[in-house]
Regions:
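Acidic metal-phosphate-binding loop of nucleotide-sugar-dependent transferases
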Residues: 2-5
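Catalytic-site signature of metal-activated, phosphate-bearing donor transferases
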Residues: 7-232
């Protein structure tokens, strides 16, 4: 698991979050927060949210991965089905446009609600006062090598390489706000691990990942990648001016691209 809901409302549960947004809300946009490897190398059997506590600045909009979001939505809203980042929307002529709020509970820009293919918050601002989604895309160097071997579940053709690492390995700030849920997390994990079969499966999964890493290190491409990960410094956020420059050109390229259909 590399995504964890980080609710900043007292109570830190989904019902607490829902109590802070308008009752007619169809969807809540939850911005990603990219967490880096925190200089960890090995595959350790420690909670992800405890191991990796350094991340990109909250206001960052570049690279594009820093501006992506996931969506918490009402099942009875104007949607057809699940999507990776946002649900598939119904025909607005029949169902209307969804009422969406941002991570601070404020209405999103109409463009976002009316552009179902839009998956990023480029130029739309990032709001995370109530909720955000901690995204641990790289984790430790060894874990990343295993991820490279596995690939991405929903984008089989996307390369998991050094460029992928550089665009996500931000360790600029320390943010431990998700630790507010640690007591509940630890209690639930203890309950799960009290089941002998689940405990056995957990140990087997950790053991498999460690052995898989050792096996991959016998092959030059994976060994070379691991070495480069160790040499690569943490990624440095670009300045707001540089981000604006890159976003402007991305928008220009999108506008000039041939329309599908």
């Amino acid at each position: 698991v590399d995504e964890f809901l980080n609710i900043h409302v007292p109570g830190h549960q989904i019902p607490d979050l829902l109590g802070k947004v308008p009752t007619d809300t169809d969807a809540i946009i939850m911005p990603w927060r990219l967490y880096g490897n925190n200089e960890r190398v090995a595959i350790d059997d420690v909670s992800v949210t405890e191991q990796f506590i350094r991340c990109i600045p909250a206001e960052a909009q570049y690279p594009v991965a820093a501006s992506l979001f996931k969506t918490l939505f009402r099942a009875k809203g104007p949607f057809n089905q699940l999507g990776v980042h946002r649900p598939k929307q119904k025909d607005p002529d029949k169902a209307g446009w969804p009422k969406m709020v941002d991570g601070s509970g404020q209405p999103v820009h109409p463009f976002l609600a009316k552009t179902p293919q839009r998956l990023s918050l480029y130029d739309l601002g990032v709001a995370r006062d109530l909720v955000e989604l901690n995204h641990y895309a790289v984790r430790s160097a060894a874990a990343f090598v295993v991820k490279r071997d596995r690939g991405l579940p929903n984008r089989a053709t996307k390369k998991v390489d050094l460029a992928y690492w550089v665009e996500r390995n931000f360790n600029t700030e320390t943010d431990t706000s998700i630790s507010a849920t640690a007591p509940t997390r630890d209690r639930e994990l203890a309950t799960l691990k009290s089941d002998p079969r689940l405990a056995e499966l957990h140990e087997a999964a950790v053991d498999w990942r460690r052995k898989r890493f050792e096996l991959l290190m016998q092959h030059e491409p994976f060994r070379a990648l691991f070495g480069r990960l160790l040499m690569a410094p943490p990624s440095r956020p670009v300045t707001p001016q540089a981000a604006a420059f890159m976003i402007r050109h991305a928008n220009l390229a999108r506008q000039s691209a041939p329309q599908k259909g």
